[in-house]
Amino acid sequence: MVKAIMHGCNGKMGQVISNLAAADSDIEIVAGIDPHDDGHNAYPVYRSIFECDIPADVIIDFAAAGAVNNLLDYAVRKNIPVV
């Protein structure tokens, strides 16, 4: 099973991807990143990508464009691919 971090998890597309992943046995969202957390996700949500310490195979990005620099810095440091 692929373990993914959902970057931008509380946006419209982040929620669509989270719901699709919940119904798919081949992928698991293990953490979310979003500055706004209303507590409705089935996984922990962090306000900053740098707060996340959960191992993952991939980061799925549907966050705002302004978040891309921190995302890519984190992904390079952790050697995690981003899609």
Give residue ranges: language-model regions:
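Extreme N-terminal starter segment of soluble prokaryotic enzymes
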Residues: M1-I5
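N-terminal Rossmann NAD(P)H-binding glycine-rich loop of SDR-like oxidoreductase domains
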Residues: M6-N19
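A structural preference for long, well-packed, hydrophobic secondary-structure segments
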Residues: N10, P44-V45, V82
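Conserved Rossmann-like nucleotide-cofactor binding loop
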Residues: K12, D38, A65
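NAD(P)-binding Rossmann-fold cofactor-contacting core
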Residues: L20-Y43
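Short amphipathic alpha-helix with an adjacent loop that forms part of the alpha/beta core around
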Residues: Y46-A56
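N-terminal Rossmann-like NAD(P) cofactor-binding module of classical short-chain dehydrogenase/reductase
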Residues: I59-I60
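Beta-strand-loop-alpha-helix segment that lines the small-molecule cofactor/substrate pocket
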Residues: A64, N69-V83
